[in-house]
Amino acid sequence: MRFLKFFMVLAALLAPALPAAAQSRMKAEEVVVAFAAEPRTLLPVTIVDWTTNNMVEHMYDRLVDRDPKTYKPIPMLATSWKVVDNTTWEFSLRSGVKFHNGEPFDAQSVKATMDYIKDPANKTHYASRWSLVKEVQIVDPYTVRFITEKPWPGLIDRISLSDMMMMPPKALRAEGPQGLLAKPVGTGPFKFGQWVRDEKLVVVRNDDYWKGKPELKTVTFRFIPEFSARLAALLAGEIDIMKDVPPHAVDLVDKSGKATVRATVSSRINYLALVTLRPGPMQDIRVRQAIAHAINVDELIQQVLRGRASKMCGPLSPINVDFSPKVQCLKHDVKQAQALLKSANIDPGRLVLTLDTPSGRYPLDKDISQAIAAQLGRIGITVNVVVNEWGTHLDKIKNRTTGDMFFLGWGPALDAQNTIEQLFQGSMTYSSYGGNKPLDDKIATAITIVDPKKRLEAWADIQQMVASEAPWVFLWQQHDLYGVANWIDWQPRADEKVWMYEAKIAKR
């Protein structure tokens, strides 16, 4: 297999500088973007999954966007907003916007979307994320109010994520969710073209987009699970943008004459979850701490990722607005790990654990998981690594059927609530830890604190509390490496939005 991969890349390097297929796409104003997996659905506000939403967002808009440099909230379908009182936010909506089917966007669209999310019958993953919203009230055709159960200063951050993409109310009533799943209808810069399962999703330019039509006529998202296959396709000119170029292949891409690596420090964090939500060794904090001491994060960063990551000590990265620098890293200490296991009456030589990992979703995820297994093997622990297809991996986490540990990334949350609330409370979809009432109470209080200074202090206290519980092995803030064809003018963003509305043809 290694020889096959070598010859695939070699053949790509020997191909013409701009293959015929790439030349044809350039003339047709089409870009092909490769992701590791296909979308899990095309129905918005359904599944919390970056890969899915990165594609779906090309067809659907939100009320609020983020500035691509500062990541502060900026207008999208809402032109402005204000706090009326502690439990009321008012949004003024953009007029003259139409869905792809001609249906007008207005206050009814906002209310219908929120009602759909909160309806238990629809079983959306986002329902819990909007639990503080009591209702959306229509003030007039282009003004809405979000009424919350308690003060919620973080609402504007939540609304700028993928949590509430606007759906057309008439089409939703007439065709139902299955109709919009088969043929998405949003207000976004691209319209649905076709979805060929296990192969590609095609979106085409919306010439009537309210912000101005995109330069690209067509964007094709191809689904290529393996890093090596994505790399070979990039160098052969079969694709134009790939995420997660393996660190060892950076020079190969840069010297190819066909593409370059464009890097950014991501808001995404990577971690090893230690599952405490069912009976097992991870329910003992001494075992969790022992595993954290036994894993050498610095070694993983240097030897596997070649330095392309920033070590973390707690649940938030420095890019997060609520990050606390006071949280200290748990040091790599084999003797301490052994002592903790001994105090827990566990013989490491008889301890067998299972680690679930995706392959191709995050930078060298499978390799990292195997390296972690090897490190734990140094103190006698046997770790069986289970490699999952991406959708299967998420389903196992959601259904609580993973092994004792799982590898996952989280982002692009830029505030504490969107990470800590979602991942350290047992009722949440992707959590691995829960049942800590003092922590739950602190989280519930922090979310409602209006004073910015007091809120920051509350989240700092929570970060320290989380770190002391060792619910994860805190790994790193991800560095994103994109391979981009030389004829495309596009720059990556820290929030991982592969936004083709911003892409242009650099040379003709």
What are these language model-derived features?
Residues 34-85, 115, 183-186:
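N-terminal lobe/hinge region of extracytoplasmic solute-binding protein
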Residues 196, 270, 294-323, 363-373, ...:
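Detector for C-terminal structural segments
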Residues 190, 278, 311-344, 359-367:
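Structural transition elements
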Residues 79-123, 139, 145, 230-233, ...:
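Aromatic- and charge-enriched surface segment that lines or borders ligand/interaction sites
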Residues 37-53, 77, 103, 155-164, ...:
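A structural "hinge/loop" feature
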Residues 23-24, 82, 127-171:
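Surface-exposed binding/hinge segments that line
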Residues 67-68, 72, 160-214, 218, ...:
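Gly/Pro-rich hinge or "lid" segments in bacterial periplasmic/extracellular proteins
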Residues 206-252, 382:
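Ligand-site clamp/hinge motif
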